[in-house]
Design a protein with these regions (language model features):
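Short alpha-helix in the alpha/beta-hydrolase fold that links the catalytic acid
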Residues: 119, 133-142
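Short beta-strand/loop motif that positions the catalytic acidic residue
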Residues: 117, 123-125, 129
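Catalytic active-site module of serine/aspartate enzymes centered on a nucleophile-bearing elbow/loop
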Residues: 146-173
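Core-facing hydrophobic residues within beta-strands of well-ordered domains
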Residues: 17-18, 147
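Alpha/beta-hydrolase
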Residues: 40-112
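Flexible "cap/lid" loop of the alpha/beta hydrolase fold
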Residues: 18-51
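Acidic catalytic loop of the alpha/beta-hydrolase fold
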Residues: 128-132, 157
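Short glycine-enriched nucleophile-adjacent loop
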Residues: 3-14, 20
Length: 173
């Protein structure tokens, strides 16, 4: 959702932005053709409807991250569990997660707005992103004519250290 918000900001207030990086984002409203696979949608719904205690919500998060992250990444670690526990306690309930999902699904198509972006733009997307399909990155690259596109081999929707190393130098330019 941060990518969606930043697209609007960069398009509407270009004088306030020197450069723009889109990571795992889309200019389109999510739909069955450009959005997540069914198993991910199902897990998002389970996570959204979680009425579990904190440990149950952590388990739902581990399952979701396992689906949308980089394959073979172990999210069932003490560190991840503690991070999730902290986030869940800080947030209180899952209402924010539900509102975020509703905002994403209800968002307007931003293609025309994104096409107006003149700010130097770097688009980064994982080639195996199951949440926002990689074709969305190619579409954004086409819309923002002066953009640079990096497709990261083996990267899912979530950014991990190994994926970051693959484009770190381009990001720091």
């Amino acid at each position: 959702m941060g990518g969606m918000i930043s697209q609007v900001m960069v398009a509407n207030y270009p004088s306030r932005v020197k450069s723009f990086t889109m990571i795992s984002s889309t200019a389109s409203t999510p739909n069955p053709f450009n959005g997540p696979e069914f198993k991910i949608t199902r897990q998002l719904l389970k996570r959204s409807a979680a009425k579990d205690d904190i440990e149950g919500r952590i388990e739902q998060s581990i399952k979701l991250f396992g689906l949308i992250g980089t394959p073979d990444t172990n999210y069932d670690t003490p560190e991840f569990r503690e991070d999730m526990r902290s986030y869940i306690k800080r947030g209180g309930d899952d209402g924010g997660f539900i509102r975020q999902m509703a905002a994403i699904i209800g968002s307007k198509n931003r293609k025309k707005l994104v096409k107006s972006i003149q700010t130097p733009t770097l688009i980064i997307h994982g080639d195996i992103d199951p949440l926002i399909k990689v074709k969305n990155a190619y579409q954004a690259h086409k819309l923002i004519g002066s953009s640079e596109l990096i497709i990261v081999e083996g990267m899912g929707h979530l950014l991990d250290k190994n994926a970051f190393k693959k484009f770190q130098s381009q990001l720091i330019k």
